Amino acid sequence: MKSCAILAALGCLAGSVLGHGQVQNFTINGQYNQGFILDYYYQKQNTGHFPNVAGWYAEDLDLGFISPDQYTTPDIVCHKNAAPGAISATAAAGSNIVFQWGPGVWPHPYGPIVTYVVECSGSCTTVNKNNLRWVKIQEAGINYNTQVWAQQDLINQGNKWTVKIPSSLRPGNYVFRHELLAAHGASSANGMQNYPQCVNIAVTGSGTKALPAGTPATQLYKPTDPGILFNPYTTITSYTIPGPALWQG
């Protein structure tokens, strides 16, 4: 058991050195909710279990990314070998979700940030990720005047990003898919880096709108999309944020 603990520590260290980040936690109107963190993977390996959290299980052991050549694989849904979170957080429609990335400072100032949502027909804790159809509710790209990307804004905000749950969204069980697309290598084929992170949230309130038909995660992006393969190191006057159209609610 002692050797397992040592291996776990080494694994966590390797992740912090080689990797980039994941959603460590998220708050809703100030209420803290734990995300799935790398420590939990090693807890599962050593003990067979880990804490019940709303963040989805994923095996991004290097805190790394999904590359464009993996866009048609299940890993693009909610990261590598992802599985639903064991519980759901609760939030009223119209609430703000603040996603906290970590464990260190996000290293990439180039690239957009997007967030999707899907309603589960039952509990999101047992949903089949391959059957989910995603609707985009938030997107941010580049400020053409300042040439500052959304990910630089995230860094300036202490690795935090705020997403508003549409006020009109009807009550139900939802999975929110929050994603950074790091574009520092986007000028080369297969150079974009996607960091999808998923959390379960039970939405309450008086909203009445159902989500429109969504898009399977494996169809959200193509490696040659103009917002995926482009030169981020030139003055940008037009940029198409990857993914389907934004739902206005």
Curated annotation (Swiss-Prot):
Gene3D superfamilies, alphabetized: 2.70.50.70
Single GO BP term: cellulose catabolic process
Binding residues annotated for O2, in chain numbering: H184, Q193
Reported biotechnological use: Lignocellulose is the most abundant polymeric composite on Earth and is a recalcitrant but promising renewable substrate for industrial biotechnology applications. Together with cellobiose dehydrogenases (CDHs) an enzymatic system capable of oxidative cellulose cleavage is formed, which increases the efficiency of cellulases and put LPMOs at focus of biofuel research.
EC number: 1.14.99.56
Catalyzed reaction equations: [(1->4)-beta-D-glucosyl]n+m + reduced acceptor + O2 = 4-dehydro-beta-D-glucosyl-[(1->4)-beta-D-glucosyl]n-1 + [(1->4)-beta-D-glucosyl]m + acceptor + H2O
MF (Gene Ontology): cellulase activity; metal ion binding; monooxygenase activity
Signal peptide bounds: 1-19
InterPro entries: AA9, AA9_LPMO
Cystine bridges: C78-C198, C120-C124
Cofactor binding notes: Binds 1 copper ion per subunit.
Residues given in the record as Cu(2+) binding sites: H20, H108, Y195
Compartment annotation: Secreted
Top-level taxon in the UniProt lineage: Eukaryota
Glycosylation sites: N25
An annotated GO cellular component: extracellular region
Alphabetical UniProt keywords: Calcium, Carbohydrate metabolism, Cellulose degradation, Disulfide bond, Glycoprotein, Metal-binding, Monooxygenase, Oxidoreductase, Polysaccharide degradation, Secreted, Signal
Entry cofactors: Cu(2+)
Pfam families for this protein: AA9
Matching PANTHER family: ENDO-BETA-1,4-GLUCANASE D, PUTATIVE (AFU_ORTHOLOGUE AFUA_1G12560)-RELATED
Function statement: Lytic polysaccharide monooxygenase (LPMO) that depolymerizes crystalline and amorphous polysaccharides via the oxidation of scissile alpha- or beta-(1-4)-glycosidic bonds, yielding C1 or C4 oxidation products. Catalysis by LPMOs requires the reduction of the active-site copper from Cu(II) to Cu(I) by a reducing agent and H(2)O(2) or O(2) as a cosubstrate.
Protein family: Belongs to the polysaccharide monooxygenase AA9 family.
Subunit text: Monomer.
Protein name (database record): AA9 family lytic polysaccharide monooxygenase cel61B
Native species: Hypocrea jecorina (strain QM6a) (Trichoderma reesei)
